[in-house]
């Protein structure tokens, strides 16, 4: 299970570490790495995800703190994709991201799900919920207040009605 918190910069990435190290974080303590083995594989993995997600950076060794917010979010997505998690919890993952980066992330999220994984998307953006989700579950006081299946009217109005 992977988790992308809303505050990627403080809760998900280590700014002083490189793009490569952040993407390959789940493998950093794998056998063989304490002796310096595996570095080329990290660079290859990071470069592959940089290309697939169109992460705009100078090199895999660039500190992740030097990237734009959208590219940092792409690094965080790449981290969980390379970890081969089957469930990904995403909390406000697209908030404040430039349109070009947003499209890349939308496309990759859809590919991730088509590959058999599941995503729990937590969002206050009704259009995202309606466009990306198979179902929208409206939560109220810790319980499901309403389930809106794909194609249902997952608008601000219908969601607010479920909350009242």
Q: Predicted regions: what is each one?
A:
Residues 1-164:
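Glycine-rich phosphate-binding loops of nucleotide-dependent enzymes
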């Amino acid at each position: 299970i992977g988790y992308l918190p809303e505050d990627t910069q403080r809760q998900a990435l280590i700014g002083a570490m490189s793009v490569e190290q952040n993407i390959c974080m789940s493998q950093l303590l794998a056998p063989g790495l304490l002796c310096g083995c595996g570095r080329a594989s990290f660079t290859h993995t990071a470069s592959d995800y940089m290309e697939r997600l169109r992460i705009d950076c100078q090199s895999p060794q660039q500190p992740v703190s030097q990237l734009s917010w959208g590219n940092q979010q792409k690094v965080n997505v790449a981290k969980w994709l390379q970890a081969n998690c089957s469930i990904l919890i995403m909390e406000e993952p697209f908030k404040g991201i430039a349109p070009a980066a947003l499209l890349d992330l939308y496309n990759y999220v859809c590919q991730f799900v088509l590959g058999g994984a599941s995503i729990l998307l937590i969002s206050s953006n009704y259009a995202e919920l309606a466009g990306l989700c198979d179902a929208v579950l409206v939560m109220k006081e810790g319980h499901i207040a309403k389930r809106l299946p794909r194609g249902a009217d997952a608008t601000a109005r219908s969601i607010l009605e479920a909350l009242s």
